[in-house]
From Swiss-Prot:
InterPro entries per the UniProt record, alphabetical: ArAA_b-elim_lyase/Thr_aldolase (IPR001597), Beta-eliminating_lyase (IPR011166), PyrdxlP-dep_Trfase (IPR015424), PyrdxlP-dep_Trfase_major (IPR015421), PyrdxlP-dep_Trfase_small (IPR015422), TNase (IPR013440), Tryptophanase_CS (IPR018176)
Superkingdom of origin: Bacteria
CDD domains xrefs: Tnase_like
Organism: Proteus vulgaris
NCBIfam families with a match to the protein in the record: PRK13238.1 (NF009709)
The protein's name in its UniProt record: Tryptophanase
Length: 467
């Protein structure tokens, strides 16, 4: 039975929200081109679009912002952030960025240049358990191919497995052999694995991937947006880490990468911010700093105010607290359990930051190229004012080489839970709304494009229902 986890905080400030009328919702969705990304937030009651930058900051984070050192160069907060990164990850070098894609835009071109300087990467490739959308876009914008090799277990949404975010080791070895180690710019370990359902990657898998990479001289990057949630799952599910602290788990995780990119808008509990950290490769760090200046800003602020770096340092501390993570993961699980008990198919077990509803099973009459999850998302919004997001064919987009729609193994509606924002009563409202739609799913129809952007289309595309 679904179990509520009591929030480990009191609420000091509230923001009024309202349920727009059915007529308002219908007009807003039509105006948005049936793409919830284009809805104004005033037309949304509960916003499950993303957990990125939607966090509620703590009193200690707000207090830390008052201490912001806004020096253009050499801000005190930069050095505090450097010390915190050393404590958590044991990496020597950091570069702040305005968000995760800023961090990728600093590091990824440098890794390609570094590989090509050695006369390699003539047909450049990045391999990941699963690149998220913006990560794949940065890979492809640099003329590289993004290859995803998450475990096949991730595609069986009904069957429980502890580690549905793991790499498929057999496929990793096959891809290295097929493309050649010289062409592999980097392996990206995404923790947790968002596109597979926010699923964790095991410590043993991270270690094996890193060992294989080192055998072939391949650089490893940890995509670290949700590293605290991944560490919590390792502590909860790996007997070796049962008695470890979350920080001890994190310290071990980062032994198995050479660098990290991070959106601090997720687990570090910020509304803005990102980070590049490099273990010990001074040459790559120097090249990345050179790129930071024209792209993000001076190397000790990287597009952030000093106050934002101060809040990041505090957020990195709070995000590692086990009591908070127990509530955080538990709230997501509560929503997932309520849906599952009502017969709504989800990625099971629930992951760290969202419930992923399996829309291939929910609306089997809609083919992938008509975006089944998007149809369900729009139905949920019209029913309740709840905004969700698609993780499937719409997000994957087209193959840049052929222009053909990429095949999505899963068609998910992601119900993404902002950190410390919504109560368990909000979870019940979401569950009741979706369960109440069960009789209508068989009547839903797909969507087609009115406008399709060439890159990251799901952000700004306009759609229309297929009659």
């Amino acid at each position: 039975m679904a179990k509520r986890i009591v929030e480990p905080f009191r609420i000091k400030m509230v923001e009024k929200i309202r349920v727009p009328s059915r007529e308002e919702r219908e007009a807003a969705l039509k105006e948005a081109g049936y793409n919830p990304f284009l809805l104004p937030s005033s037309a949304v009651y509960i916003d499950l679009l993303t957990d990125s930058g939607t966090n509620a900051m703590s009193d200690h984070q707000w207090a830390a912002m008052i201490t912001g050192d806004e020096a253009y160069a050499g801000s005190r907060n930069y050095y505090d952030l450097k010390d915190k990164a050393k404590e958590l990850f044991n990496y020597d070098y950091i570069i702040p960025a305005h968000q995760g894609r800023g961090a990728e835009n600093i590091l990824f071109p440098v890794l390609l240049k570094y590989k090509q300087k050695e006369g390699k990467a003539k047909n450049p490739v990045f391999i990941s358990n699963f690149h998220f959308d913006t990560t794949a876009a940065h890979v492809e914008l640099n003329g590289c191919k993004a290859i995803n090799i998450v475990t096949e277990k991730a595609f069986d949404s009904e069957t429980y497995d502890d580690w549905k975010g793991d790499f498929d080791i057999k496929k990793l070895k096959e891809n290295i052999a097929q493309h050649g180690a010289d062409n592999i710019v980097a392996i990206v370990s995404t923790v947790t694995c968002n596109s597979a359902g926010g699923q964790p990657v095991s410590m043993s898998n991270l270690k094996e991937v890193y060992e294989i990479a080192k055998q072939h001289g391949i650089f490893v990057v940890m995509d670290s947006a949700r590293f605290c949630e991944n560490a919590y799952f390792i502590k909860a599910r790996d007997p070796k880490y049962k008695n470890a602290t979350i920080k001890e788990v994190i310290f071990d995780m980062y032994k198995y990468a050479d660098a990290l990119t991070m959106s601090a808008k997720k687990d570090p509990l910020l509304n803005i911010g990102g980070l590049v950290a490099i273990r010990d490769n001074e040459e790559i760090f120097t090249l990345a700093r050179q790129r930071c200046v024209p792209m993000e800003g001076f190397v000790t602020y990287g597009g952030l105010a000093g106050r934002d770096m101060a809040a990041m340092v505090q957020g990195l501390e709070e995000g590692t607290e086990e009591e908070y993570l127990h509530y955080r993961i538990g709230q997501v699980k509560y929503l997932g359990d309520r849906l599952r008990e009502a017969g709504i198919p989800i990625q099971y077990p629930t992951g760290g930051h969202a419930v992923f509803v399996d829309c291939k099973k929910l609306v089997p009459q809609i083919p992938g190229d008509q975006f089944p999850a998007q149809a369900v998302i729009n139905a949920l919004y019209l029913e309740s004012g709840v905004r969700a997001v698609e993780i499937g064919s719409f997000l994957l987009g087209r193959d840049p080489a052929t222009g053909e729609q990429k095949h999505a193994d899963m068609e998910f509606m992601r119900l993404t839970i902002a950190r410390r924002v919504y109560t368990n009563d909000h979870m019940d409202y979401i569950a009741d709304a979706l369960i109440g739609l069960k009789e209508k799913f068989a009547t839903l129809k797909g969507l087609e494009f009115e406008y399709e952007p060439p890159v990251l289309r799901h952000f700004t595309a306009r759609l229309k229902p297929i009659e």
